[in-house]
Design a protein with these regions (language model features):
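Short, intrinsically disordered N-terminal pre-domain segments
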Residues: 1-14
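Flexible, small-residue-rich N-terminal segments that precede or flank a structured functional core
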Residues: 6, 16-82, 112-121, 128-134, ...
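Extended extracellular/luminal ectodomain segments enriched in beta-structured repeat modules
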Residues: 72-75, 85-95
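Beta-strand-rich interaction/scaffold domains
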Residues: 100-173
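Aromatic sugar-binding interfaces of carbohydrate-active proteins
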Residues: 173-185, 191
Length: 211
């Protein structure tokens, strides 16, 4: 049985001897949300002091309080269950698809994964520590916004490959993707994504992987 009764969408590729394309969607309320850190210097924090996982949006944010010169950082997370990929399989491509309902700023948004064999849904702020990030990082330049249209990231196969190459990775495990801003000067940088809890899961984040 699939967790939450929601199977992935499978679109098998034809020809070329490859595996296939599979689209996974966030399928539970606690599987997307944000880690936030307040009153920080301009450098991106290594830890966070707030976790939110039940809102209808997940913000990726870097904002400065001009009166005090301190920053708020919020990074979004999206956890995808039941990834049907064997340990060490070659990832041909991988894309994060999200609906960004609103945003501001033009700095590049960063995409990483949680470097874990079978990441659990976040339950404490330490689950957002940057020490858990993959070494692979992909930049997404100035993502567009729209109330209902999905935006597709650049290829993040290096992020997914690093996770499935782990020695204890197994088919059926979960992958969590995170997005954050670590630059942008004093200009507010924001992308606000729809979450599983928005409008009865009408626009959950998706992870499209081809093997």
């Amino acid at each position: 049985m699939f967790k939450n009764g929601i199977p992935p969408t499978i679109n098998w590729s034809s020809g070329g001897g490859g595996g296939g394309e599979v689209t996974y969607a966030v399928s539970a309320s606690g599987d997307d949300g944000v880690f936030s850190s307040f009153n920080q210097p301009s450098s991106f924090p290594s830890g966070f002091n707030s976790l939110g996982a039940t809102a209808t949006d997940a913000k990726t944010l870097r904002e400065v309080d001009e009166d005090f010169g301190l920053f708020t950082y919020t990074k979004a997370f999206f956890r995808f269950q039941n990834i049907n990929i064997s340990q060490g399989a070659t990832i041909q491509s991988a894309y994060l698809k999200v609906v960004y309902s609103t945003g501001t700023g033009t700095a590049a948004l960063k995409i990483v994964g949680t470097d874990a064999d079978n990441v659990a849904a976040p339950s404490q702020v330490s689950d957002g520590a940057t020490s858990l990030h993959t070494s692979a990082v992909v930049s997404w330049s100035n993502p567009s916004t729209h109330s209902t249209n999905y935006q597709t990231s650049p290829d993040i196969k290096t992020v997914v490959q690093e996770i499935v190459d782990r020695g204890s990775w197994a088919s059926g495990n979960a992958i969590m993707i995170q997005t954050y801003y670590d630059s942008g000067g004093s200009t507010k940088q924001l992308r606000q994504a729809r979450t599983y809890d928005y409008s009865s899961a009408a626009y959950p984040a998706k992870l499209v992987i081809t093997t």
